[in-house]
Structures are given as C-alpha cells and as structure tokens.
C-alpha cells in the first residue's frame, strides 16, 4: 500500500529529537511522500531545512495558518508573497483557512487572509491545504466565488459541526 501524509509539522522543535527515526518509521510503513505546511514566518526556515534534508520525500508548502492571523497579518502575508515570488520549491499554499475554535477576535482578518492566499493559489497554479475548525460557513463564503475556477486542494482539520446547510458541501466537490 502506498500512503501519502498530506499534512505534517515534523519540522517543529518538539519533534527534533527523533525526527530521523520518525521519517524511517514512516518509510517502513509505506509512506511515500510527506507534505509539510508552513505555519507563519517563524517556521519557514525549519520547514525548508527539513525538506532539504529529505528532498524528494518531504515537500514544503507556504501559507499563513489561521491561528497565526493577528494584527500583524499584513506583514506575514508579505513574507508569504515574497516566498512564492522567489522560490519555486513550494508544492501548495498551506496551511491556510480559518479557526474559530480558540478565538474569534480576528475573524474578519482570517477571511481576508484566506481570500488572498486562495488568489495566490490560482495565480501560481498551486493546490491549497485548508484548515477548517468551527468555521465552515465562513470558509464557504470565501470559497464560493471560486467554484468555477481551477482551484483545488484538500481540507485538514475539517469540522462540520457548525455547518448551517449540508448542501454547502457542493463548493468543495
């Protein structure tokens, strides 16, 4: 069986002690690819380093995670834009989306950030990796205008508990 890990933050400090062993166990279990989504500007270097060490096995994605969206989001987006412009090694825009589980303070900003990154996905012809926690209706409102575009990707952490209309799933099919 061939397995693909579509979402792994193994480059984070808490995994550094046994990172090589984790990679070997993943290979032994049949994992053929590991996709690594960025979180914010503080994790780009570690993510790229991990992907460099395991080139052809670990693949970098770039984006601003919704829980990292705050008053400083424009500066973070500038960094993502620069990475996209000057590096061709990114295989997707991620991890992007909305997360209202912990905090709703930056709800509007999360919508703005998601929309901007979806536009980049289309501009650079990259798939998206969407983090959706207690926010499907809001994400739907952002994605709905893109329904007839070549936008593609996957959902991660998809929680449908707060979905208002099941028919809204048509935006993702």
Range-by-range predicted roles:
Residues 1-164:
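Mid-domain alpha/beta scaffold segments of enzyme catalytic cores
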């Amino acid at each position: 069986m061939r397995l693909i890990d579509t979402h792994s933050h193994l480059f984070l400090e808490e995994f550094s002690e046994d990172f090589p062993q984790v990679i070997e166990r993943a290979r032994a279990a049949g994992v053929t690819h590991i996709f690594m989504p960025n979180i914010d500007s503080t994790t780009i270097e570690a993510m790229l380093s991990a992907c460099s060490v395991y080139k052809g096995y670990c693949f970098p994605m770039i984006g601003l995670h919704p829980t990292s969206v705050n008053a400083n989001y424009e500066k973070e987006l500038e960094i993502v834009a620069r990475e996209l412009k000057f590096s061709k090694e990114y295989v997707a825009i991620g991890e992007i989306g909305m997360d209202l589980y912990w905090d709703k303070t930056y709800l509007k900003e999360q919508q703005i950030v998601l929309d901007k990154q979806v536009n980049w996905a289309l501009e650079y012809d990259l798939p998206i990796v969407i983090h959706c926690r207690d926010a499907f209706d809001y994400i739907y409102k952002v994605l709905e205008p893109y329904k007839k575009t070549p936008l593609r990707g996957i959902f991660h952490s998809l929680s449908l508990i707060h979905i208002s209309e099941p028919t809204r799933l048509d935006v993702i099919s």
